[in-house]
Every structure is written in C-alpha cells, then in structure tokens.
Amino acid sequence: MAAAAEPGARAWLGGGSPRPGSPACSPVLGSGGRARPGPGPGPGPERAGVRAPGPAAAPGHSFRKVTLTKPTFCHLCSDFIWGLAGFLCDVCNFMSHEKCLKHVRIPCTSVAPSLVRVPVAHCFGPRGLHKRKFCAVCRKVLEAPALHCEVCELHLHPDCVPFACSDCRQCHQDGHQDHDTHHHHWREGNLPSGARCEVCRKTCGSSDVLAGVRCEWCGVQAHSLCSAALAPECGFGRLRSLVLPPACVRLLPGGFSKTQSFRIVEAAEPGEGGDGADGSAAVGPGRETQATPESGKQTLKIFDGDDAVRRSQFRLVTVSRLAGAEEVLEAALRAHHIPEDPGHLELCRLPPSSQACDAWAGGKAGSAVISEEGRSPGSGEATPEAWVIRALPRAQEVLKIYPGWLKVGVAYVSVRVTPKSTARSVVLEVLPLLGRQAESPESFQLVEVAMGCRHVQRTMLMDEQPLLDRLQDIRQMSVRQVSQTRFYVAESRDVAPHVSLFVGGLPPGLSPEEYSSLLHEAGATKATVVSVSHIYSSQGAVVLDVACFAEAERLYMLLKDMAVRGRLLTALVLPDLLHAKLPPDSCPLLVFVNPKSGGLKGRDLLCSFRKLLNPHQVFDLTNGGPLPGLHLFSQVPCFRVLVCGGDGTVGWVLGALEETRYRLACPEPSVAILPLGTGNDLGRVLRWGAGYSGEDPFSVLLSVDEADAVLMDRWTILLDAHEAGSAENDTADAEPPKIVQMSNYCGIGIDAELSLDFHQAREEEPGKFTSRLHNKGVYVRVGLQKISHSRSLHKQIRLQVERQEVELPSIEGLIFINIPSWGSGADLWGSDSDTRFEKPRMDDGLLEVVGVTGVVHMGQVQGGLRSGIRIAQGSYFRVTLLKATPVQVDGEPWVQAPGHMIISAAGPKVHMLRKAKQKPRRAGTTRDARADAAPAPESDPR
C-alpha cells in the first residue's frame, strides 16, 4: 500500500500545469498514460501514420504520429504546426508538435475524473448555438446545437456529456470536504484570441483550438504551463468585493438537483447527454459522421456494460476486417474513454434479440468472446453487429481510498482488496496511513461517490459490504464508471438535516397559525420536522425549516406546481449564508434579473452573471420575485443590489426593499440598474444608459463596483375609490383602497392611455415584443390613433397641492415627475429658469406637476421642440377623479375608478448607485484581463 502526496491544494500529473477544474491528485497517476497499440478510429482530416513513443509525462494520452492534410494548430502552444507530421491523442484528439510533447500536462479525458479535487456536478442549460466555442471532451468546434454549463464555462457536444467529468465550480459548502481556503478553478480553452498570459504576458488564447487556461473565479488567464507559477490561492480578482465567497454559503445535499439548488428553470433534454438515448448511435471520438466503411473495414456497435445496453447507448468503431482481438478491444476502449488495462477486459457478443430489448441480463452473452484463436469481428466471416465490453473476474485489486477531509498531506492511499476485504476492514487499514490511528475506527465509515457529469451521488457502504464484489458490480453496469467512482473514508458525523424552503404565492395578510394550517392542508406537512421560521404576511410568503431531506424534497415537488385559493405557489430551495465568515471589506452584490424585460436579453444576462459571480446571489424575478433574494441576504451586514429590467422592474424591487427594510441587517442597500426595458428613464438619469445593448457583463459589474451613491425620493400613492366625485357612482361597487409606490412619474390621462394600449397589445402577443425598436414603433402607432382624441381632462379631475386648490389649464394629460426624464429620455419640465419654482432634483422632496395638451404636444416634447406646461411643485397632492380615467405609475398602467388619489413622500429616501463618469484611458494602458475574458451573452454576435 502507498500514500500519494498532495503538493499544496492541487497536484498535476508530472507537475507543472493544472487540470481544468479543482484537482488534487498524485503524480503516481501519471503512469496511467499508456501507449495503446493499433490504429484508432481516425482523426478526420489527418491520416494515421507511425506511432512514435510518447513521453511518460503526458497524463493519460495515447499519442501517435499522423500525417496532416490541412492546416492544424498545436493545442499546447496554439502555434501552427509546420510540416506534415503531428502527434494526435486517439482518445481526446489533443494535437501537439513533437517539441511540445514533453511539456503536455493537460490530462486526457480518460483519466481526467481521477484528477478532480472535489467532485461537483454540472448544471446544463438548453441546447443552443455557441459560436467559436470548442467541446471540452473531443476538442472539436461546436457547430450544431450544443450544451453549456450554467455555472461554469464548460461547453460540450450532447454525445460527449457522458465522458465529461464532474469538475464544476464549488459554489457552496455541503458538509463534505468543506474548507475556507479557495483555490483557482482552472478551465481550459475558449479564451478570447487576444487573451494574454498572466505570467509571461504573451498571447495565450486562440480562436483555432482549445488552448490556454482561465480561472473561473478571478478570471486570470495563462498558458497551461505558466499557470503552475501562479499562487494556488484565488482572491476572486477585480470582483472580490462583489462575489459571495463559497465558504460563506452552506447548502446540505438533500436530493435536490443543481438546477433546483440554483433556482434555474430546468430544460427537458433527451437522455443524459443524448448519447444515443433514443436508440441512435453516438459517433466516435472524432465526431465525424460515420460513413460507409472502406473496403476491408467494418463498423461495430460497442456497448459499455449493462447500463449502455439497457439505454441503447453505443459507440461506433471502425476497424480492419483483419484486425486482431487486442486491436479491436483497444479501439473499443478508446471510443469509450476507458483507461483500464485491456488485459482485464474482453468483448462479448451481444445477441440481436438483446439489442431490441429494453433490459438485458448482462453476462448471458458471454459465450461469444473475442479471442485470438476464435472468430473475431475482424475475421472476415459473418460476425455480430454489436459487442459489449466486459470485465474479467479478479482475485484481488488495488483500490484508492481518499480522505473525506482536505487538511491532510495526501490525496489518497492505495490498499489491496481481496474477496475477504470489507468496508470495515478497509477503514481499519487506511486510518493509520492517514495519521488517524489514535481515533476510534467506529467513528469512520466508507463512502462511495459516483462522480457523474450531471449528478454526484454519495452512498454510505455497510460495514460488511465486500468491496471486490462491489467493484465487479460497478463494472458489470459500466466499465468506465469505475474510473468515475471514488471511495472516501469519512467521519461518521451526525449532520442534522436542514433545508430552508421558500414558499410564495400564498394569500397575504394571514396569521402564523393560518399559514401553518393552510400549508398542512395543501401539503400534509409533518409538524415534527417542518416549522415556519419566517413569515412575510404582506407578500403572502413563508420560509419553512425542514429537518428531513426526504420531507423537504416531497414538499418541494408538491408545492412548486400547486395552486392555493386560485394562486399558483412558488417553492424555492434557499441556502444558508454564513455572514460571520464574510471578509471585512466584502459588500456582495445581490442580482435580480427580469428575463421578460425588453429584448429578452435577461436570459443571457442570467447565465453570464451566474458564471461571473456565485450563482447563489443571482435571482430570476419570474421565479418568486425579489423576496427570496432579500430574505437570503437579510443577515448580511453590507450588500448592494443590481436590478436588470425596465422601470417597472426597478419599482418592483424598490417596493420589496421598502417592505422588508426592517428585517435587513443592511437596512439601506444601494441599488444599481441595468436597463432592459423600453423607456428606462431612471437608468438614463443615473447614467446607466438608454438600454442594454450587449455590453460586456464583466464591465457592467466593474461599473457597479465603482458607482457613486446618491439619494432618491420615493412617493406613496393612495388610491381610494370609495368617495366618488359623482353622485351617480355606487360606493358599494367601488374598488377597495390600495397603495402603490412611485419612483419616476405618475401619469393621468392621455399618456397613461397610450401606455395602457401598448400594455394590452403586448399581453395579447408577447412574442412580438422582443425588440426595443419594435416596442417604440407600437407606441408611435398607438399615438397616431389617438391624435384627434379629446377628453378635456381638466374638466374631469380636481387638483390640490399642499391642500390648496390649483386651477388646471386645458390639458389632456397630467403628469407628476420625480426625475428629469420622461417618455424615454424627454425633459418634460424643461430647462428654462422660472422664479416660481425651485430647480428640480431627484432628492429634493418635491414633485413637479406638468400638463400636456395631447399626442402632438407629447411628440414635440420627446423631439426636444417643446416642454410641458408647468403647473405646480410640492410634496403633498390630492387628485379627485370625477370619471374612470387611465393612470400609470412608472410604466404600469390601469384604469382607475372615480375617487381620490393622494400622493405623499414615502418615508426615507432610497439609496441608488449612479454610474461614475468614464475617465479617459491613457495611451499604452491595457484592459483588465478579466474584461477580455468575461463571457459575453450567448446571443451576442461577438
């Protein structure tokens, strides 16, 4: 038995360069890169040549010399390969100069799972087109719709997903291998072509091949060799004050998927990775479409164990009809990225009847085995079409046991298991090797971890579980699965199950007892393990503390699609924030994104911000609104907010902040805006622009970090329809009083009527309103229809300012403005000096009242030809509506019944963030490396 040293936080095969991900492995594994004889399935544009002896340092690669038939670039140095010869890995398609072979430290995909430091599953979004991106498994360019991880920069072909390893970013602590020191999380390739190495300052990116590495937390970029010269600890780069550190977030695994943990809307995908899940073939490592075999060759279906047969997932392998059994087996192992010794494996014939069945009892077809003496697929005779890879029985085996804690100087220890070895005997054997011999073995247990690309599953093994039988069972299901399975010796700590479940959409205004009773009726909650920890009565939401993982999962699945009293519920899993562990200078950013706002750019921004920050701090407003995020950050002593949406979205978030202010440890968080709507007047005033048009999301975050804090008035509007101004109105049918908050402006009359018509048109056909230009065109068309309309608004309303009656001129619209921007940037108040009024400011505690005479007047104001009719300025207003009249507040319109409207200041001013003025960059200065490397939205034409 042996112990493998762990140099620092990560170890790289042969030393030198990092495994993209979070590696912690042993240099001993470097010998896993064995040369496999025989030609592979062909690299596509290159022709197979003579195999050259590859360097032992190349981790897991199977290099052979090939003759190049088209321009090719080296995957290590990204330079052009001059001449006709290159070296290609038959498994992962890594291409290299001969001179670069001895420097290759990027591991082959066949051994990559064994190098991951902490296994973390990926979270894939829907398939999409990703321009100039490369697959992390086969290293080919992504041309057809492909998959990408929502949390990290992993891009994959759908049929390559089963061969990717679980090396996603670790965004929270889950009770397994928790640690406070954070290391770089390296991801290979897909860097901008102009990216520069942090160490040598030379270009390290490429648009031709998968080359270079980048930390997915701090954004530092480097050559794979140069990255070894960097300190292993990651400081989160320029965004360190905005990022929520993973060590400060705790979420215990309770059966929830990654998409559920990160509140990501799940997309239905056919099968795991789509690798032939519908019975279709998955092509070989080169991903070229399988053509008719050349004369003298044949194509075989190769299955990896019972699970692949049951799912009808196979790989196509083309071999010579004269190929021997060893050569065919080698080609099959390369196609399935299996790093095991071929001497321990065999190919068994799969009967045609078994291929058509949904389930197949493995081992029944073992009578037809490829052997050198017997018939093989290359014998030239009638041979079966499908074969399955099988493991030969073993009398003993060397097993790697990993410690379940990270603060130890070894990555793993190796023990020999025999038919008599059990989980308990292995624990007794490895504890002295890990320096824990003084502790009681009863407090430790063996844990099996299946490291799938989509799921990481942990299973506690029984003390009497025979390990050799367990390994054979795993190989029976899938030979490759053994390389994706680890065994950890972990302390048997009784971690109390705890899940925080946010439930929204409940009837507002109920008592705690009524909410508990309502939830018990809806979900049959168990009082012994479910309790209500927080109640937001005015918003109709509660937070449940669930002390049982199974009960939490049951409640989540039940409540998320349930309707109570005609209202659809929302159920979200929330982590716990360990605010005491936040760095002293940390002021994390809480991000709210409305994906439905103008142009539908919010979907791309959601993905970009999840990758640039911790996904736990990014919230989709269509999935529960702003309240879940505010509850999660309620104990954070200092944080900021970024709202991505239109003016209505900003008002929604500010209103939620107002209602929850007394619950927040940071009662006055500053709010920044990324304008996604049509008008975006508040965004204009605060210098965030007229609308988002594809700017670099990383640059947006930098601007938020550097923004200046300013104050802004908020106003409360009381709408009371009980006291109608007309005697013919029946108060019994009047609307109940309601209160709305206002930040920008409130319009009565013609402008609200135009907004209402636009709003109704968008609700009827929302798919057409995806362009800001189209939206403005609809406004123009609606305005032209109203150009001759006259309703003499001044005769239908009464206005009091500071309790004094104000006579209104002949107008069609009355507008109360709080900011110097209205109707997509128009200056309604005007810039002319007037001794009757003070110069308006957004924090002066005053509203300006302006009138417009009609659609033509509004058009002239927006064109800068005129200004509105100045009527009054004050802090308290009372408007009497004599008839039902269109009203809009911050772009949200409705028809208000006759009655009163009272507008007054709404308590303390809100803290907003105004974008700092751009400082001219001096000649010769370079951009921040992360700004070059930040992921642009997927729909960005860049």
Curated annotation (Swiss-Prot):
EC number: 2.7.1.107, 2.7.1.93
Residues annotated as domain DAGKc: 584-721
Residues bearing PTM Phosphoserine: 22, 26
Any Pfam family the entry gives: DAGK_cat
PROSITE patterns, sorted: DAGK (PS50146), RA (PS50200), ZF_DAG_PE_1 (PS00479), ZF_DAG_PE_2 (PS50081)
Gene Ontology terms describing biological process: adenylate cyclase-activating G protein-coupled receptor signaling pathway; cellular response to bile acid; diacylglycerol metabolic process; epidermal growth factor receptor signaling pathway; G protein-coupled receptor signaling pathway; glycerolipid metabolic process; intracellular signal transduction; lipid phosphorylation
Catalytic activity: a 1,2-diacyl-sn-glycerol + ATP = a 1,2-diacyl-sn-glycero-3-phosphate + ADP + H(+); a 1-O-alkyl-sn-glycerol + ATP = a 1-O-alkyl-sn-glycero-3-phosphate + ADP + H(+); 1-O-alkyl-2-acyl-sn-glycerol + ATP = 1-O-alkyl-2-acyl-sn-glycero-3-phosphate + ADP + H(+); 1,2-di-(9Z-octadecenoyl)-sn-glycerol + ATP = 1,2-di-(9Z-octadecenoyl)-sn-glycero-3-phosphate + ADP + H(+)
Name by which UniProt lists this protein: Diacylglycerol kinase theta
Organism: Homo sapiens
